[in-house]
């Protein structure tokens, strides 16, 4: 069965999906960009849940992901993924970013979630080149969904038009029919 992957331009905090992915930092305590937006929209319960995870597991290293409740968000849960900081590509950034996406997909499936939304992990303050990050994201999600039944649908939520067009082009090359 062909994977169900879509892309939209919008605000990930308003997505009515089972789980949204947060591009988190290792502390899980919120920050700038999408991380800060998710924490603000979710309310104080999300920060408390992240504090509990930190107390139990410590910091979340790059490539890893953890799951928490969603607080005031319309989603059921939030998966916090820590992507790599871009250092020019010679510090295994690509494999770390791929691992982050894979771990998110695995956590969603393991928890029975059928629909999920991703931001463009590591492309904000972490400086990962958008085109390279989009290619890794699409390839990783496509490969995973081609082999596994869950999650059933993944949506990439793009903050800007440039990123949206990158994802649209990549998904079209993969033969995805996009709702535009």
From Swiss-Prot:
Superkingdom field: Bacteria
Pfam families attached to this UniProt entry: Macro
Catalytically driven reaction(s): 3''-O-acetyl-ADP-D-ribose + H2O = ADP-D-ribose + acetate + H(+); 2''-O-acetyl-ADP-D-ribose + H2O = ADP-D-ribose + acetate + H(+)
GO BP terms, alphabetized: purine nucleoside metabolic process
Active site: 35 (proton acceptor)
SMART domains (UniProt xref): A1pp
A GO MF label: purine nucleoside binding
E.C. code: 3.1.1.106
Role description: Deacetylates O-acetyl-ADP ribose to yield ADP-ribose and free acetate. Down-regulates ribonuclease 3 (RNase III) activity. Acts by interacting directly with the region of the ribonuclease that is required for dimerization/activation.
NCBIfam families per the UniProt record, alphabetical: PRK00431.1-1, PRK00431.1-6
HAMAP family: YmdB
Protein name, as recorded: O-acetyl-ADP-ribose deacetylase
Species name: Enterobacter cloacae subsp. cloacae (strain ATCC 13047 / DSM 30054 / NBRC 13535 / NCTC 10005 / WDCM 00083 / NCDC 279-56)
Organism phylogeny: Bacteria, Pseudomonadati, Pseudomonadota, Gammaproteobacteria, Enterobacterales
């Amino acid at each position: 069965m062909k994977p169900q992957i879509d892309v939209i331009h919008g605000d990930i905090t308003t997505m009515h999906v089972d789980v949204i992915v947060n591009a988190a930092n290792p502390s899980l305590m919120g920050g700038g960009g999408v991380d800060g937006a998710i924490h603000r929209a979710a309310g104080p319960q999300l920060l408390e849940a992240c504090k509990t995870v930190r107390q139990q597991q410590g910091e979340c290293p790059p490539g890893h992901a953890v799951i928490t409740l969603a607080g005031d968000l319309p989603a059921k849960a939030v998966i916090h993924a820590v992507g790599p900081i871009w250092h020019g590509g010679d510090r295994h950034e690509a494999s770390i970013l791929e691992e982050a996406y894979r771990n998110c997909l695995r956590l969603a499936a393991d928890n029975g979630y059928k629909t999920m939304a991703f931001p463009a992990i590591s492309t904000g303050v972490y400086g990962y080149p958008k085109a390279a990050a989009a290619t890794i994201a699409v390839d990783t999600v496509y490969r995973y969904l081609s082999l596994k039944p869950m999650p059933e649908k993944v949506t990439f939520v793009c903050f800007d038009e440039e990123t949206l067009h990158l994802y649209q082009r990549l998904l079209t090359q993969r033969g995805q029919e996009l709702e535009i």
